[in-house]
Amino acid sequence: MNGERWCITGLHHVAIAHAGDAVCEDAVRSLLGPPGQVEDGPGFLERMYEAGPSFVQTLEATGEGVVQRFLDKRGPGLHHLAFQVDAIDPALEDLAARGVPLLDREARAGGMGTRIAFLHPAALGGVLVELVEEPEAPTDPLGVDQEGR
């Protein structure tokens, strides 16, 4: 899905949704160690675990919202794949021009200082896809930028 003005630079994270399943969190924690970042979202708790150059994100439903609706419809498991892009605005413009179905026509703020946008699941055979653009000075999951600040 690369274009002339943008490209996918790697897998940013894989997200797993659950409804407060300690077994899921314990399994991820035993494999990857403690989460580097924990954030409250609207109706969910997000934990980011480092997995080499990528992350595993767990989304725990804590109330009504997108994660709970996903769980009601599909149950626990893979929520989405997130690909890192070098330029999210040209990516969205290019994908829209190609007729790729988008959930977000404009990028919005994401975790860890990123800008994000979601493609409709129909764009990739029923799998929800997120595009992620890292900030100019990427931060690690603990909130420290690469310069050590």
Where do the language-model regions lie?
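A cross-kingdom feature marking solvent-exposed beta-strand/loop segments within repeated
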Residues: 2-6, 11-12, 29-43, 62-79, ...
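Structural preference for beta-strand elements that scaffold enzyme active sites
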Residues: 13, 55-58
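A general secondary-structure boundary signal
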Residues: 13, 21-25, 35-37, 46, ...
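Amphipathic alpha-helical segments
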Residues: 19-35, 91, 95-98
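Short, charged/polar surface micro-motifs in flexible loops or helix N-caps
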Residues: 52-56, 63-64, 88
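Vicinal oxygen chelate
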Residues: 1-7, 10-20, 47-50, 57, 69-149
